[in-house]
Amino acid sequence: MINYLKSFFLYEIIRGMTLTLKYFFKPKVTINYPYEKSPVSPRFKGEHALRRYENGEERCIACKLCEAICPAQAIVIESDERDDGSRRTTRYDIDMTKCIYCGLCQEACPVDAIVEGPNFEFASLTHTALIYDKERLLNNGDKWEQALANKLHKDYQYR
C-alpha cells in the first residue's frame, strides 16, 4: 500500500527535483576549459623537454639510461664522441605515441637533462608530429626552462 501511494504521488520524481533544486543555485564546479585552466601539480608529467646548462650547452651526456629504462621503448638515442673525449647525442628521438608518461626517464637521468614539463596541450592530427626529435625537445626545454627549474627544485626532496 505504501509503495502504491509513493508511486501515486510521484515520490521519486519529487525527490529527484528537490535534489536538483538544492544544487541549482550553488556555485558551479566545472571549468570553462579553453578559457580557464585548473592549477597543475608541481609533480605533473607532461610534454618532454631536453634542458641546457646556463652557458647554452646541452645537458645530455649520452649515457642512454633513459633509453634503457623506458618500458615503452619510446626513446632512441645515437651518440658520437667529441674531440675532448666526452660523448654527446647526435640523435635523440621520443615517440610520444608510445610514451606512457611514467617519468622513469626523468628519474634515471643523472644530469636532469630529460624532464617532463608542465605542458599538456600538444595534441596533433598526424602521427609524425608526435615523434619529437632533438631540436624540438631542446626548443621545449628553452621555452619551459624557468618552469622546469622550479618543478625540479620543488620535487628535489622526493628524489
Curated annotation (Swiss-Prot):
InterPro entries: 4Fe4S_Fe-S-bd (IPR017896), 4Fe4S_Fe_S_CS (IPR017900), NADH_quinone_OxRdtase_chainI (IPR010226). It catalyses: a quinone + NADH + 5 H(+)(in) = a quinol + NAD(+) + 4 H(+)(out). One of its GO terms (molecular function) is quinone binding. Its cofactor is [4Fe-4S] cluster. It comes from the Bacteria. PROSITE patterns: 4FE4S_FER_1 (PS00198), 4FE4S_FER_2 (PS51379). It holds the Pfam family Fer4_7. GO terms for biological process: aerobic respiration. It is found in: Cell inner membrane. The keyword Transferase does not apply. [4Fe-4S] cluster 2 binds at C70, C99, C102, C105. NDH-1 shuttles electrons from NADH, via FMN and iron-sulfur (Fe-S) centers, to quinones in the respiratory chain. The immediate electron acceptor for the enzyme in this species is believed to be ubiquinone. Couples the redox reaction to proton translocation (for every two electrons transferred, four hydrogen ions are translocated across the cytoplasmic membrane), and thus conserves the redox energy in a proton gradient. NDH-1 is composed of 14 different subunits. Subunits NuoA, H, J, K, L, M, N constitute the membrane sector of the complex. This is NADH-quinone oxidoreductase subunit I. It comes from Rickettsia prowazekii (strain Madrid E).
